[in-house]
Amino acid sequence: MYGDLALQLVNSSHRTTLSSTPQLPLPKYALPLILSICLETRQLGTSIASIAESHGQLSLTQDRGLVCNLTVQHLAARRNKRCMLAYLATRVGGIKERWWDAGGGLAYLLSPAASASVNPEADAPDLRSALSPQELDFLRGYNNLLLDYKSDFLDVLDLTAGIEKPPGEIMVDVRVVRDAGEVFLDSGERVDFRKGQRFRLERAQVERLIIQGYLEEV
């Protein structure tokens, strides 16, 4: 039946928005389903054009059954388009959300480390494999746009810093939960973050590592 594939696409996208998990893995881009919907839409367009051409203008104004048939096909094609746009808009929102959750760290976001806690039964092991080539281009462009925007006042404000829990102190005690290796802090100090170690450092120096899951506050 017309529209069944589009409804399946929207339902699969809607289910991901119902979860309360903040780091819900983005489902893999549904390319086969998208192509099937596009094919159905093109077939509807071809059918509408063929019927309209074969019956002529006079029949289109007098034959109510014919008008009803064309209207149903036209509405089905428009519905397919709306469903695909809703699906893509949901994914774009999810991509942006994950960029902010990662503190603007694009390399980390696209690495397997960012999906270390993802359900092994997920259809995509990491974000990179879940995105289409066009979505990857969008993510890189979005990243470049935000980096360019915030570069003018980076010494005053970091837009990617979390604001849900404002820091209460300048210094913070952290424990390394995942090896990060040697990191040069803004102060020039070199710190070797190994799992299990504890440090007391300025929050601003390690905020990004906390967001990315290498460190946790203690």
Swiss-Prot record:
InterPro entries: GINS_A, GINS_bundle-like_dom_sf, GINS_Psf1, PSF1_C. It comes from the Eukaryota. Keywords: DNA replication, Nucleus. The GINS complex plays an essential role in the initiation of DNA replication. PANTHER family: DNA REPLICATION COMPLEX GINS PROTEIN PSF1, PARTNER OF SLD5. Component of the GINS complex which is a heterotetramer of SLD5, PSF1, PSF2 and PSF3. This is DNA replication complex GINS protein PSF1.
